[in-house]
């Protein structure tokens, strides 16, 4: 092994070997249990971010554990075609490079252009996955536009349509006026902004008056432009001010339309004026009110969000209606929506109908891709009747067929699913799964897998023109089929039989509804087991938190706080990091601030930490369901952990290579107490690690590895072996060498799922030295399980006592500033015979590691000189202090330390006693100051105790 651990020199070559040797594939033995995970398909346009790295580390750890347990494991990888995102990338590319739009190309040629782009640039994220050590079966890589998956999508759509679970209807959707498509709620970014609330007077019709004698009511709105489409005003039926007006009408200003006053609890008596204008075609809440009261819907906006030349009028079911005229005042026709807002407010003012304007904090919806304000828009779209599909999906979680980890997310799932609305699945894009529906010239719709099937099933002659629907399916529709569509469904493939249902889905809470719930609905509707029972897509949903920056802020390009996992693996210099964070920004005005913060946070750029350090950090921070504040210091700490494992392994190899390790038949072996202890500690670690993995507590599993490797194996066991290897008998040395190499080999196997590269590299050097270990790779070795035969409680208890004894000596040396190399005379006032026996049995180790001149057990009642003392269990350890220290110099040193500590206490108490500081400082800063104060106060008590002890000498 190389003297120092250098991840750069081993990782990529090692991964290439793993992949070429086919170690990631299922072993295919169907007599063994199967285990499968489907990677949530990242967007093909994307690159690896910290969230991916986090979830992929979790999945790879789970998969490697199960593979090492002998299971037939499949971790299937793939990417999503990402409709809007991909289309925008290619549209921007042809605009920048060729000055063309998609319309210059035409649909088919533009789609060819996207396929070209995918071939050239679409594999970035899968290349990066390899850098993370992801042991996915690359031969089964899938894409949501693959021929096989396309066939599954078409099949699902056709069957749902024939089951009357898909229909085409006119409903309200999130409309992106820039991209000209409906978008999902997840693609809407709500931004807090300062705005206004306009209070308009709406005149009452037919001479009606309010309870206080006014001939108008006042409505409050943040969107004056939509009043052109008002079809009602809602008041609360319990509101004494207005309840007598229910059933009356108002004359809508500007357009002169008579519209009813309806009683509806949507109107809040305590909010605004208590009167709410209802615009069913341009507000989601109003749409529901309109349906309840069968109000007409008037669409006043074009797809560009300009005012139409003539309104569209529909009844509450979305059918064309003549309930109202379509006239829009000429001055507003074609006007941009926000210009219309100003003009309408001005006209209300001219008419004397603008009562007041109030400042108002608004939440405004923006499209996360197009970047413009989203409009609720009445459009013809395709919908899934989700309520019918949701019922069995709810029951699957209620009865435990699917479990959420942490369990609290079940409530989030239930709250969505029990109030589910029909799902809009069509998008006005070119890139995606085109909807398999055709129209004749009369507007009749025909659904089938292809045009030939449509003509055959419906007896449509070849000379009758058919036009395919221009829309494509929402990407969430196709990705809802991910667990079964990628395994060959609708064919009954062997893979589908073996690997479905999958075992675990690792995902974020933000897509429980958009993806997780829809996968459950679709899978249970289409996949049945041999007994005809609906299959679930996965047995467990492991919900992770978000990775945030060190301050707890969400990572985003606009904040300039994004960390690239690859930069932490390979390192990046400061100038490159600044350029990366400030380049291609949507808001270039933020660049200077981002540069300043980056230079402050990363003065020297980012070091290369290697993949294993990153993976271990991510695992160690994976507390289920909680958001994680990224901490570069922990990454540095776990890089040190990898170095510690490397150096410990070199020590083991230096003491075992070309040595007698006791594997020969009949070899005499005399195991030390420490040998038995480390075997027992390992068994406990294996038991804990497996339990934590089974419970999805990767943070605790990583902590178990850290505690065992760093604290037990490296810090204690290796030290405890030195007296044996230097001065022990041949039988003792043989046994210790055998223990060193076998425990290291088992430890490497236990740690491998979390830190695969370093463990494989070391294992290749260790393997030849351990009898009975065969195979070319550690990843196909057995994951260690608890073995009671190797567990010795007495050895555990005895070595814990030995550790406490040595630690107490070291602590006393530090407290009294005794030279760490000076041999000490130590006495023990033993509490029982067991402790006296422990001294006798372990004297060579105690003398060596605690650096003692002598050690003896005191007789009962024996007088002792002035000593420094410590408790070890129930016994008292004593170090005679005469001649060990310069009493006057030590008292002088302690006096200075005490004065310094008292000064710090006074300073912090003054700070915390300052009302201005406490009122203005963040809670975290105040907490930190209080913690510092407690630390200084504790230190002061110890210093004064030491001073008293030394003064008595």
Curated annotation (Swiss-Prot):
It is found in: Cytoplasm. Its main location: cytoplasm. Residues 884-952 form a coiled coil. Its EC number is 6.1.1.9. InterPro entries: aa-tRNA-synth_I_CS, aa-tRNA-synth_Ia, Anticodon_Ia_Val, M/V/L/I-tRNA-synth_anticd-bd, Rossmann-like_a/b/a_fold, tRNA-bd_arm, tRNAsynth_Ia_anticodon-bd, Val-tRNA_synth_C_sf. GO terms for cellular component: cytosol. A motif ('KMSKS' region) lies at residues 554-558. ATP binds at residue 557. It holds the Pfam family tRNA-synt_1. ValRS has two distinct active sites: one for aminoacylation and one for editing. The misactivated threonine is translocated from the active site to the editing site. The C-terminal coiled-coil domain is crucial for aminoacylation activity. Belongs to the class-I aminoacyl-tRNA synthetase family. ValS type 1 subfamily. This is Valine--tRNA ligase. It comes from Vibrio cholerae serotype O1 (strain ATCC 39315 / El Tor Inaba N16961). The lineage of its organism: Bacteria, Pseudomonadati, Pseudomonadota, Gammaproteobacteria, Vibrionales.
């Amino acid at each position: 092994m190389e003297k120092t651990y250098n991840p750069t020199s081993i990782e990529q070559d090692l991964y290439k070997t793993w992949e070429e040797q086919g170690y990631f594939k299922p072993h295919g033995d169907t007599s063994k249990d199967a285990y499968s995970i489907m990677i949530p398909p990242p967007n093909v346009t994307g690159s690896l971010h910290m969230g991916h790295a986090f979830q992929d580390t979790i999945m790879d750890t789970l998969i490697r554990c199960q593979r090492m347990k002998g299971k037939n494991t499949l971790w299937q990888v793939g990417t999503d075609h990402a409709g809007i995102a991909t289309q925008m990338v290619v549209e921007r590319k042809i605009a920048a490079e060729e000055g063309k739009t998609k319309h210059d190309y035409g649909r088919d040629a533009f789609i060819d252009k996207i396929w070209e782009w995918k071939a050239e640039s679409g594999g970035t994220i899968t290349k990066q996955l390899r850098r993370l050590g992801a042991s996915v079966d690359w031969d089964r890589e899938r894409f949501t536009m693959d021929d096989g998956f396309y066939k599954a999508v078409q099949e699902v759509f056709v069957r749902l349509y024939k089951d009357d679970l898909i229909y085409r209807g006119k409903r309200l959707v999130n409309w992106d006026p820039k991209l000209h498509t409906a978008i999902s709620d997840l693609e809407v970014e709500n931004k807090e902004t300062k705005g206004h609330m306009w209070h308009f007077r709406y005149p009452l019709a037919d001479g009606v008056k309010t309870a206080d004698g006014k001939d108008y009511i006042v409505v409050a709105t943040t969107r004056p432009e939509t009043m052109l489409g008002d079809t009602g005003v809602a008041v609360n039926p319990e509101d004494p001010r207005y309840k007598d007006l229910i059933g009356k009408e108002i004359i809508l200003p500007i357009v002169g339309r008579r519209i009813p006053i309806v009683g509806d609890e949507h109107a809040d008596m305590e909010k605004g004026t208590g009167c709410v204008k209802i615009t069913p075609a341009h507000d989601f809440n109003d749409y529901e009110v309109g349906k309840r009261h069968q109000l007409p819907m008037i669409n006043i906006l074009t797809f560009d969000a300009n005012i139409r030349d003539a309104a569209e009028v529909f009844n509450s079911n979305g059918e064309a209606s003549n309930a109202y005229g379509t006239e829009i005042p000429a001055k507003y026709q074609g006007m941009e929506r926000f210009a219309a807002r100003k003009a309408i407010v001005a006209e209300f003012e001219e008419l004397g109908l603008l009562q007041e304007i109030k400042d108002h904090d608004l939440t405004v919806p923006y499209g996360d891709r197009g970047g413009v304000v989203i409009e609720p828009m009445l459009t013809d779209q395709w919908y899934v009747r989700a309520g019918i599909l949701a019922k069995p999906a709810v029951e699957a979680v209620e009865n435990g067929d699917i479990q959420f980890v942490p369990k609290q997310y079940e409530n989030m799932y239930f709250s969505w699913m029990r109030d589910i609305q029909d799902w809009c699945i069509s998008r006005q894009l070119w890139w995606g799964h085109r909807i398999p529906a055709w129209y004749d010239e009369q507007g009749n719709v025909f659904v089938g897998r292809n045009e030939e099937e449509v003509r055959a099933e419906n007896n449509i002659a070849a000379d009758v023109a058919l036009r395919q629907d221009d829309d494509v399916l929402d990407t969430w529709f196709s990705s809802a089929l991910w667990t079964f569509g990628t395994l060959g469904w609708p064919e009954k493939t062997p893979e589908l039989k073996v690997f479905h249902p999958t075992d675990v889905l690792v995902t974020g809470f933000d897509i429980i509804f958009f993806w997780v719930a829809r996968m459950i609905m679709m899978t249970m509707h289409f996949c049945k087991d041999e007994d005809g029972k609906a299959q679930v897509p996965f047995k467990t949903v492991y919900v992770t938190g978000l990775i945030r920056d060190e301050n707890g802020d969400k990572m985003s390009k606009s904040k300039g706080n994004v960390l690239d996992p690859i930069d932490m693996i390979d390192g990046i210099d400061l100038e490159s990091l600044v350029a990366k964070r400030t380049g291609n920004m949507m808001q270039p005005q933020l660049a200077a601030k981002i540069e300043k913060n980056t230079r402050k946070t990363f003065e020297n750029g980012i070091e290369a930490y290697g993949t294993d350090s990153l993976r271990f950090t991510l695992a160690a921070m994976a507390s289920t369901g909680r958001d994680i504040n990224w901490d570069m210091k922990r990454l540095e700490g776990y890089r040190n952990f990898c170095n510690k494992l490397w150096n410990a392994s070199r020590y083991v190899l230096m003491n075992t290579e070309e040595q007698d390790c006791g594997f020969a038949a009949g070899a005499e072996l005399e195991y030390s107490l420490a040998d038995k202890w480390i075997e027992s500690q390992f068994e406990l670690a294996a038991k804990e690690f497996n339990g934590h993995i089974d419970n999805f507590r990767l943070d605790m599993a990583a902590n178990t590895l850290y505690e065992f490797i760093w604290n037990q194996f490296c810090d204690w066991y290796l030290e405890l072996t030195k007296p044996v290897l230097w001065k022990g008998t041949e039988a003792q040395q043989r046994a210790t060498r055998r223990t060193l190499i076998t425990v290291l080999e088992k430890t490497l196997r236990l740690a491998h799922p979390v830190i695969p590269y370093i463990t494989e590299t070391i294992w290749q050097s260790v393997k030849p030295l351990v009898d009975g270990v065969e195979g070319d790779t550690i990843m196909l070795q057995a994951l260690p399980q608890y073995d009671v035969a190797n567990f010795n409680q007495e050895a555990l208890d005895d070595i814990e006592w030995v550790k406490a004894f040595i630690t107490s000596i070291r602590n006393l040396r530090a407290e009294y500033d005794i030279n760490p190399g000076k041999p000490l005379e130590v006495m023990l006032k033993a509490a029982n015979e067991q402790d006296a026996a422990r001294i006798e049995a372990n004297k060579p180790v105690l003398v060596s590691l605690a650096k003692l001149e002598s050690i003896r057990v005191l007789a009962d009642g024996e007088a002792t000189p002035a000593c420094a003392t410590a408790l070890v269990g129930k016994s008292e350890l004593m170090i005679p202090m005469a001649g060990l220290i310069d009493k006057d110099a030590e008292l002088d040193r302690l006096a200075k330390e005490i004065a310094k500590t008292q000064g710090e206490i006074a300073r912090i108490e003054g700070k915390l006693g300052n009302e201005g500081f406490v009122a203005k400082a963040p809670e975290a800063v105040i907490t930190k100051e209080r913690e510092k104060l407690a630390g200084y106060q504790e230190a002061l008590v110890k210093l004064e105790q030491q001073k008293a002890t030394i003064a008595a000498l």
